[in-house]
Regions:
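A general secondary-structure junction signal
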Residues: 104, 135-137, 309, 339
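ATP-binding/phosphotransfer module of carbohydrate and carboxylate kinases, centering on a glycine-rich
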Residues: 1-77, 93-95, 144-149, 193-390
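Glycine-rich beta-strand-to-loop/alpha-helix junction loops that act as flexible
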Residues: 101-107, 155-157, 302-314
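A short glycine/serine-rich beta->alpha loop
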Residues: 51-53, 107, 174-182, 332-337
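Short beta-strand-loop/turn "lid" adjacent to the catalytic site in phosphate-handling enzymes
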Residues: 70-125, 130-132, 142-145, 231
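Phosphate-binding/catalytic loop of phosphoryl-transfer enzymes
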Residues: 108-206, 361, 372-379, 384-390
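Anionic group-transfer/hydrolysis microenvironments
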Residues: 23, 30, 105, 138, ...
């Protein structure tokens, strides 16, 4: 495997950068320039990257990424020709890619092959010498708030909170629907179905409104176990009922209570990872996170908490109680909508890497930059909430 030679400290504003978002719905790739905001063009590969006993399949990712990258470079060359009124016999060369950042679901736990194989393969195929390999939570963070200190709650089928003071990462939840993801889509959907089944049985805590929605979506309540338990995508099936809970919340106190509980879990995760404001100390003193409690806020100014992901498209039935719970746990916190998605975040990381201005904390599994280490070296800071690896 080729290891890329040392790259110059920074690339010029016209150099290309690539951002990649690999998730359950496939691979998304964006081409941009160092000196421009936003992508020049994007493309989608609908097939998810395979995961096997050895982790995420690096070869399968490359089989999709390399043609996509060349397609985007060809588009850029054609666009440049149209803008200048000239014609070229070739395309933009792969050597013009100054940096590439990949954010992948499962990178932290299943990304060893990617970290071992991709840097050399990308150097050989695309001539790129600056590569960042990130967990999808990190690209979600970069997409939501950029390189500022703060916290991001990424909610979808699951739920994870990630925060940083630009020195280390802090993680809360994201442990899957059996061990956590409290307040996420699957959690809300399961709680809603539980309330529906309670109404079906005549037990306390039931909701007739949610039982009606269960029947409309899945059919007879007594047949639901046979539909749900054989499925390999049970979290997604549970999460599909979460919008029904939100739709009932305005008139049904049980549904509203489920969303308020979810909001409490979401706010607790955000409070666990949100760095204290500059000049203040958390409960451990000296600005530390102490034992995980919410940081003190003696200045009256809280940190930034961004909400991102499809979960929050349920709107005010969920977002309003989340704001209320955050105001209680993090007084003065600024709750914001994400300014971009994980693909935006991957492109932002690539731009910062190309410009020599990547300020987000390095970590061997969360944000690994191989050009900053020798072959086989995994350096970086620890993630609170996750054992250090590498």
């Amino acid at each position: 495997m080729t290891h890329p030679p040392a790259a110059p400290a920074s690339a010029g504003p016209g150099a290309f950068v690539l951002g990649v978002d690999s998730g359950g719905s496939g691979l998304r790739v964006a081409l941009g320039r160092v000196g421009l905001t936003g992508p020049l063009s994007t493309t989608v590969c609908a097939e998810p990257v395979r995961t096997g006993p050895g982790g995420i399949d690096a070869g399968h990712l490359l089989d999709q990424l390399l043609p996509a990258a060349r397609e985007l470079l060809e588009r850029a060359a054609a666009s440049d020709d149209a803008a200048t009124g000239t014609a070229t016999t070739g395309t933009a060369t792969t050597g013009e890619i100054a940096a590439l950042a990949i954010g992948a679901a499962g990178m932290a736990t299943l990304g060893e092959r990617l970290r071992a194989e991709l840097p050399g393969a990308l150097a050989d195929a695309l001539g790129v010498r600056r590569v960042a390999l990130a967990a999808d939570a990190v690209t979600a963070y970069a997409g939501a708030v950029g390189q500022r200190p703060g916290a991001v709650v990424a909610g979808g089928t699951g739920m994870i909170a990630l925060g940083t003071d630009l020195k280390e990462w802090h993680r809360a939840d994201g442990w899957g629907h059996l061990l956590g993801d409290s307040g996420g889509g699957a959690w809300i959907g399961r709680a809603g179905l539980d309330a529906a089944m309670r109404a079906h049985d005549g037990r306390r805590g039931g909701s007739a409104a949610l039982l009606d929605r269960l029947r409309a979506v899945f059919g007879p309540a007594e047949e639901l176990p046979g539909l749900l338990y054989p499925r390999s995508d049970r979290p997604a099936v549970l999460a599909s009922f979460a919008p029904e809970v939100a739709a009932c919340a305005g008139a049904d106190p049980v549904a509203a209570g489920i969303l308020r509980q979810a909001a409490g879990h979401i706010a607790e995760a955000a409070a666990a990872v949100c760095p204290p404001p500059a000049g203040t100390a958390g409960p451990g003193g000296e600005g530390s996170k102490g034992d995980g409690a919410a940081p003190s806020d003696e200045s009256g100014e809280g940190g930034e908490v961004a909400l991102t992901g499809g979960l929050f498209r349920m709107g005010e039935p969920l977002v309003a109680p989340v704001r209320e719970e955050l105001a209680r746990l993090l007084p003065g916190a600024r709750v914001t909508a994400a300014t971009g998605d994980p693909l935006t975040g991957a492109l932002r990381i690539a731009r910062a890497l190309a410009a020599g201005d990547l300020r987000l904390p390095r970590h061997p599994t969360m944000l690994f930059v191989p050009s900053e280490h020798g072959p086989g070296e995994h350096g970086g800071t620890a993630v609170r909430g996750e054992p250090r690896t590498g």
